[in-house]
A protein has these predicted regions:
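Membrane metalloprotein/metal-transporter helix-bundle signature
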Residues: 2-200
Length: 200
């Protein structure tokens, strides 16, 4: 009977033992490619920007979606390779947050931009993500394998999300996409508040 009384204490003691902390890059144990993919999937700011870009491109049609799907991974890969060689870039979380908020505003207001401008926005956002992620990977001694995981995951997310939006022509469906854009902006405002308080 007394042994059962010790079991909860033993379990609590084992649960309290700290494990290794990972500051930024997720170590999945599956290799650098999947570490990079998980890094992107677990970075809410990066995910929201990619989602907003995909929604914007999808609202503008097939040509704009194809332009974004081409420009984003190209810029992300090239800027990431440059970022791997740079010294540590200062924390620019506020710039990344403002960038995805801008994309969310464009979605929420259903701004009609030509495919060339969509491609340019995708290229600029991809460059920003590439420099920031490449520099982060360099500080973690992660290399091109992790960068490729990030690039291919971003490519697939934008490809699938924009492809889901392109065929939506019903008024209510387009409003739903625009509401999602407004939520991206709302989350960005929350993140800016956290950044201002130093919580992120």
């Amino acid at each position: 009977m007394k042994r059962l009384g010790l079991l909860p204490w033993l379990a609590a003691g084992l649960a309290a033992l700290p494990g290794a902390a990972q500051a930024h890059l997720v170590n999945s144990g599956l290799g650098p490619f999947y570490d990079g993919a998980l890094h992107l999937l677990l970075s809410p700011g990066d995910l929201l920007g990619l989602l907003a870009l995909a929604l914007l491109a999808g609202l503008r049609g097939t040509t704009a979606a194809r332009a974004a799907v081409t420009a984003l991974p190209t810029a992300l890969l090239l800027a990431g390779l440059i970022g791997l060689t740079l010294p540590v870039i200062p924390n620019l979380a506020w710039l990344s947050t403002l960038a995805f908020m801008l994309l969310g505003v464009l979605v929420a207001f259903d701004v009609r931009l030509p495919p060339v401008i969509i491609a340019a926005l995708a290229g600029v956002y991809g460059t920003l993500l590439g420099l920031l992620n490449g520099s982060t990977l360099a500080t973690m001694d992660a290399g091109v394998g992790s960068l490729l995981g990030i690039v291919l995951t971003a490519f697939m997310l934008v490809l699938l999300a924009s492809a889901a939006v392109v065929p939506l022509h019903a008024f209510w469906a387009r409003i739903t996409v625009r509401v999602a854009g407004s939520w991206v902006v709302a989350v960005g405002m929350l993140m800016l508040g956290w950044l201002a308080q130093g919580a992120v």
